């Protein structure tokens, strides 16, 4: 995990943050881990007025009303899709985590990243528009990898999946005879379904 992050020029920090970075490299889905002991209730909103916010890179930034933010109730804890804040940072003593795996609007993230002069690996991915179905897959992957490292850890709450606009389910129809003719072999229907 650490070797792969270093090959991709992503610095290693602590296990929980490293797992989110690893999954971003593996699946393309950015995630953010908040110290669960510092978070009561996650709220996603834009601020009513401008304010100063210190991001994880220890830089004080001016947040304007058109910047999408993540709040703990009314306290800002992250710039949505770009970078978290210092106040909810994962540290070595973190024993509880609130995991964010989201799908933020690419245009909004790009404008905020540009205005803040803060382009990150996460913002670069959000700018390209992500598959909303990857968010749950990324959360499940995080849990699996964490349990591989620490089998005693447990998921303390239900996973919440909120869609602003649900994508319609797509059905793909194809002719099995065409698949057999194209591949030159007879592939069982069950294997085709499993592969798809």
Feature names for model-found ranges:
Residues 4-7, 11-196:
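RNA/tRNA-interacting regions in translation and RNA-turnover enzymes
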């Amino acid at each position: 995990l650490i070797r792969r992050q270093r090959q991709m020029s992503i610095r290693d920090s602590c296990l929980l943050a490293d797992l989110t970075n690893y999954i971003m490299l593996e699946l393309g889905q950015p995630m953010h881990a908040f110290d669960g002991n510092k978070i009561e209730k996650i709220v996603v909103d834009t601020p009513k007025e401008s304010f100063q916010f210190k991001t994880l890179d220890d830089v004080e930034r001016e947040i304007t009303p058109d910047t999408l933010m993540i709040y703990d109730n009314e306290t800002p804890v992250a710039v949505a899709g770009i970078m978290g804040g210092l106040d909810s940072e994962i540290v070595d003593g973190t024993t509880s985590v609130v995991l964010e795996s989201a799908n933020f609007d690419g245009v909004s993230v790009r404008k905020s990243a540009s205005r803040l002069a803060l382009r990150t690996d996460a913002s670069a991915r959000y700018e390209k528009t992500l598959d909303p179905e990857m968010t749950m897959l990324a959360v499940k992957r995080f849990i699996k990898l964490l349990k591989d490292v620490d089998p005693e850890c447990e998921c303390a709450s239900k996973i919440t999946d909120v869609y602003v606009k649900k994508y319609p389910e797509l059905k793909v129809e194809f002719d099995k005879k065409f698949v057999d003719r194209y591949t030159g072999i007879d592939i069982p229907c069950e294997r085709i379904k499993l592969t798809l």
